[in-house]
């Protein structure tokens, strides 16, 4: 299938009620919060634990999005739940399928408070032996990474734990990854096991600027009695919010990735301006102190290859020196051009020389194969269609290194 053959599937859905009529969702609540919500609606105390267990199983194991499908819950209880709560998925505005099997969903969440509805994109990348979902944590981004398509776009708001988890639930719906579900005909996905085996917090926004919601969502995603993803298959990527890095390992316990991209402070100040606040020494010191760090649980360092900017042999030498003493994997990302950028991708021969040098020093240094370019789903290219039309409000998100993250076992 050629680039022009990429499929676009429009998914119009009924409008959600206005914010004033919006029911609270049970998705994204901790067990304690779910118990409190049921208690407030008059569920007898002696039933609370059992009802929470039922709901948890139906929402996260069976994947239902309608209370009427909860067949072991009494009808009067289902009616109460329907009256006061929701477990609905976000609206799918558009679904695109790349010729390499990559899927991109444009999702719309309802207005909250005095705000307006917001849109984000989630991306699924099937690979041999795994399927990786890239999830967003914010609408927009406060970071101004100069090589990224989203670098000048403002933050609208944080996503809630519900909205973060809903991206995973919706993807599993669409891919037939819940019990008794079938995948769309012709879907490219792993031959065995889960369709969504890995998730990466690398979509729109900086996850560590929305720490509490991200923490709650990931703890639910890795809960052994629910979605049950292995923490070794969940990767959180940060541009370097140093104060929250230790907390990420201590309180969430997932794999860590760092958007590095430069080995000198003067250059990283330009490419990743958060470096002005948290320079390289502080960042690397925080990485060395990451809880659970070992050769079996290495930190991944992302490094976008920019021609004549950061791709010299001296840069490769500096990278090895910088990461000395850090159990690390270095992912080299060929730059994905976007309209108006002044950067170019490094020549392939130079990328291979860079990778060989890093590898000879003992670091795994895979070169990431670009995916989903025909639907603008590749690294740094993601941007919702509705926001392309609203040029003065350009909202988008960074999708750093979606594939090749987390453990395979």
Curated annotation (Swiss-Prot):
Highest taxon of the lineage: Bacteria
Amino-acid positions noted as binding S-adenosyl-L-methionine in the UniProt annotation, renumbered to this chain: 205-206, 237, 259-261, 336
Obligatory cofactor(s): [4Fe-4S] cluster
Principal location: cytoplasm
Gene3D superfamilies for the chain: 1.10.150.530, Aldolase class I
Active site per UniProt: 121 (proton acceptor), 379 (s-methylcysteine intermediate)
Location of the protein in the cell: Cytoplasm
Pfam family, one: Radical_SAM
A GO term for molecular function: rRNA binding
Keywords: 4Fe-4S, Cytoplasm, Disulfide bond, Iron, Iron-sulfur, Metal-binding, Methyltransferase, rRNA processing, S-adenosyl-L-methionine, Transferase, tRNA processing
Domain Radical SAM core per the UniProt entry, residue ranges: 127-376
SS bond partners: 134-379
GO cellular component annotations of the record: cytoplasm
Entry's cofactor comment: Binds 1 [4Fe-4S] cluster. The cluster is coordinated with 3 cysteines and an exchangeable S-adenosyl-L-methionine.
Annotated residues for binding of [4Fe-4S] cluster: 141, 145, 148
GO biological process, one term: rRNA base methylation
Protein family membership: Belongs to the radical SAM superfamily. RlmN family.
Note: Reaction proceeds by a ping-pong mechanism involving intermediate methylation of a conserved cysteine residue.
Protein role: Specifically methylates position 2 of adenine 2503 in 23S rRNA and position 2 of adenine 37 in tRNAs. m2A2503 modification seems to play a crucial role in the proofreading step occurring at the peptidyl transferase center and thus would serve to optimize ribosomal fidelity.
Protein name stated in the entry: Dual-specificity RNA methyltransferase RlmN
Species of provenance: Rhizobium etli (strain ATCC 51251 / DSM 11541 / JCM 21823 / NBRC 15573 / CFN 42)
């Amino acid at each position: 299938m050629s680039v022009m053959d990429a499929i676009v599937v429009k998914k119009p859905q009924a409008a959600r009620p206005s914010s004033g009529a919006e029911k609270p969702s049970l998705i994204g609540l901790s067990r304690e919060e779910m118990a409190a919500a049921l208690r407030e609606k008059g569920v007898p105390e002696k039933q609370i634990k059992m009802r929470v267990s039922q709901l948890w199983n139906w929402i996260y194991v069976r994947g239902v999005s309608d209370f009427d499908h909860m067949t072991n819950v009494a009808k009067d209880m289902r009616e109460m739940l329907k009256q006061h709560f929701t477990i609905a998925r976000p609206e799918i505005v558009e679904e695109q399928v790349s010729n390499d099997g990559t899927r991109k969903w444009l999702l719309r969440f309802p207005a909250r408070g005095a705000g307006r509805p917001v849109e984000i994109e989630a991306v699924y990348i099937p690979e041999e032996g795994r399927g990786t979902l890239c999830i967003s944590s914010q609408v927009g981004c406060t970071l101004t990474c100069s090589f990224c398509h989203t670098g000048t776009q403002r933050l609208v708001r944080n996503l809630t734990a519900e909205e973060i988890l809903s991206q995973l639930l919706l993807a599993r719906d669409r891919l037939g990854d819940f019990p008794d579900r079938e995948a769309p005909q012709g879907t490219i996905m792993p031959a065995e096991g889960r369709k969504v085996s890995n998730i990466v917090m690398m979509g729109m926004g900086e996850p560590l600027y929305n720490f509490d919601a991200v923490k709650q969502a990931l703890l639910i995603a890795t809960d052994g009695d629910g979605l049950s993803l292995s923490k070794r298959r969940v990767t959180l990527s940060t541009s370097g919010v140093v104060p929250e890095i230790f907390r990420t390992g201590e309180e969430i316990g997932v794999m860590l990735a760092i958007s590095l991209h430069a080995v000198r402070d003067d250059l990283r100040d330009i490419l990743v301006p958060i470096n002005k606040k948290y320079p390289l020494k502080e960042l690397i010191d925080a990485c060395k102190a990451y809880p659970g760090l070992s050769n079996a649980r290495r930190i991944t360092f992302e490094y976008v290859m920019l021609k004549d900017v950061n791709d010299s042999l001296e840069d490769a030498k500096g990278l090895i020196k910088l990461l000395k003493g850090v159990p690390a994997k270095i992912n080299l990302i060929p730059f994905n051009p976007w309209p108006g950028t002044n950067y170019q991708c490094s020549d392939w021969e130079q990328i291979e020389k860079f990778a060989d040098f890093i590898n000879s020093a003992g670091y795994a240094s895979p070169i990431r194969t670009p995916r989903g370019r025909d639907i603008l789903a590749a690294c740094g290219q993601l941007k919702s269609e509705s926001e392309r039309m609203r040029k003065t409000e350009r909202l988008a998100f960074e999708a750093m290194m979606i594939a090749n993250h987390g453990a395979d076992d």
